[in-house]
Amino acid sequence: MTTDYKSPLRVGIGGPVGSGKTALLEKLCKAMRDDYHIAVVTNDIYTKEDQRILTEAQALEPERIVGVETGGCPHTAIREDASMNLAAVENLARKFGNLDVVFVESGGDNLSATFSPELADLTIYVIDVASGEKIPRKGGPGITKSDLLVINKIDLAPMVGADLGIMASDTNRMRGQKPWAFSNLRNDVEGLEKIIGFVVEEGMLVSHSEKAVSG
């Protein structure tokens, strides 16, 4: 089936409530928007709060940020019945025609949440240090099967008594060779470069400047 628009890379960003998914998405958009054509789909159960936050933060032009009200379990909207999100991604792809990547942020969910492969080409799962040192070893598909695991809010480790060394060891044990990154996205951009590098490399993205040189 042929289309008159480019099929973008779709990157799913999941994780529990308050882990820093929206903060990560804002940083990614602001860091990548000059080099790539980007759009975003956010998910909330009863509101479009994350869409509003990203719009007010001027992460992208407002028309590039679409909010989906799932009206139910966040997991269902990204896995069992992803139709609303699939439609939102397709509408954005049709509207802009040349999108390189669409980020799909799930509503806050538990460690068992995963994206349908029909919806996401790559998945990033975000947990945070404030939830406790033991989180990585609890496992669950988000921690063990996501393409990239992000352990956010490392600046809070001393305040909550979390040992980052133990968290790193547990993460390596749970994920094997799968990549992961520590991050501090509130007051710093620690870890952001590694996350962007993962998206660009694994998603085989080509920047505007690279296209200009090769073209």
From Swiss-Prot:
GO terms for biological process: urea catabolic process. Keywords: Chaperone, Cytoplasm, GTP-binding, Nickel insertion, Nucleotide-binding. It comes from Alcanivorax borkumensis (strain ATCC 700651 / DSM 11573 / NCIMB 13689 / SK2). It comes from the Bacteria. Pfam families: cobW. Gene3D superfamilies: P-loop containing nucleotide triphosphate hydrolases. Facilitates the functional incorporation of the urease nickel metallocenter. This process requires GTP hydrolysis, probably effectuated by UreG. NCBIfam families: ureG. The keyword Cytoplasm applies. Belongs to the SIMIBI class G3E GTPase family. UreG subfamily. This is Urease accessory protein UreG. Homodimer. UreD, UreF and UreG form a complex that acts as a GTP-hydrolysis-dependent molecular chaperone, activating the urease apoprotein by helping to assemble the nickel containing metallocenter of UreC. The UreE protein probably delivers the nickel. GO terms for molecular function: GTP binding; GTPase activity; nickel cation binding. GTP binds at G15, P16, V17, G18, S19, G20, K21, T22. GO terms for cellular component: cytoplasm. It is found in: Cytoplasm.
